Amino acid sequence: MIHSLFLINCSGDIFLEKHWKSVVSQSVCDYFFEAQEKAADVENVPPVISTPHHYLISIYRDKLFFVSVIQTEVPPLFVIEFLHRVADTFQDYFGECSEAAIKDNVVIVYELLEEMLDNGFPLATESNILKELIKPPTILRSVVNSITGSSNVGDTLPTGQLSNIPWRRAGVKYTNNEAYFDVVEEIDAIIDKSGSTVFAEIQGVIDACIKLSGMPDLSLSFMNPRLLDDVSFHPCIRFKRWESERVLSFIPPDGNFRLISYRVSSQNLVAIPVYVKHSISFKENSSCGRFDITIGPKQNMGKTIEGITVTVHMPKVVLNMNLTPTQGSYTFDPVTKVLAWDVGKITPQKLPSLKGLVNLQSGAPKPEENPNLNIQFKIQQLAISGLKVNRLDMYGEKYKPFKGVKYVTKAGKFQVRT
């Protein structure tokens, strides 16, 4: 299936490659680099690229491209899902999936890739099994390995490999038993010039951190589970129970994992938490223009909207901008023509604004279109869809665990047209 894997940074450097069958030359990545140059943004590089002798299937994660080389036709989503699993494993092992972390742990990276794929086909992808096969790096283990010449590869086969619940290792014991859940929702929206919503959708995930002894059986119920669409489950979820009762019933993996991801596609259920008043104008046959935007809370359910940033890709004829913010600070890059306004948090009592003059190239024609505003924000302790966890029940063990739920709403691709 997968012949080779190349890891490429944003500068276009191939800093790691792994081959499972015959060695594929790095020159095959030239097709990927051509597609990258044509793409308007790094996230818009086609995930599947056809070449005369290969298929290149890639993902973009944490400023890195994972590019796999395929010689026969396979379902692309299958390969994409596996590449995401590789990135998740690096994140779990090293704390971050970055070029520096991968280079610092390059031996463990190759050991993991060797275990995750057998002759190019997925074999062991569950984190609990991999951690029994290959021990996660620690400072003490690194020192011992350098002195003794040993490796992080385990001496025994993982106990869960042949189990009917391979995602959980046996003999788990904790002094403090805890079960925490993070409900994280991202709003993707397009707002037109008049402030009306053209498109709105919520992408949500529930991430779990489970540190429970033994073999607990958990049931997680919600106040309003019917609003969820296109739910994707971790393999531990009993799907029939969800279909009949809308309850998540599962024996959890040990540690951190993604329990479900979901979508709320009904625009009536998507509350837009911020509004933007804008006035951007360029005069014909003039070397200046006006820029005026104000941002405020709209539907925040009584919570504070924080971490607000506004990014604007100005037209190429813009030379400079002389603006005055009532809150926060702004920067303008005259080379990339990108205006970035770091607002911070907002309250209804004081609405932040950014206004001033725009300097244009002398004699240049008036820009045909006004720029779009890209908004980023975060709201703590709020799931904007209204999703709420009702209760968590545990069976099979007699102790009482600590339980907690945290809600976060943030902007995904949130665009305001001017």
Swiss-Prot record:
Record GO biological process:
anterograde axonal transport; anterograde synaptic vesicle transport; clathrin-coated vesicle cargo loading, AP-3-mediated; intracellular protein transport; intracellular transport; melanosome assembly; platelet dense granule organization; postsynaptic neurotransmitter receptor internalization
Keywords, comma-separated and alphabetical = Cytoplasmic vesicle, Golgi apparatus, Membrane, Protein transport, Transport
Superkingdom of origin? Eukaryota
Q: How does it sit in the membrane?
A: Peripheral membrane protein
Record domain MHD: where: 176-417
On whether Transmembrane is a keyword of this UniProt record, the answer is no
Write down what this protein is called: AP-3 complex subunit mu-1
What broad taxonomic lineage does this protein's source fall under? Eukaryota, Metazoa, Chordata, Craniata, Vertebrata
As recorded in Swiss-Prot or TrEMBL, the protein's gene is named: Ap3m1
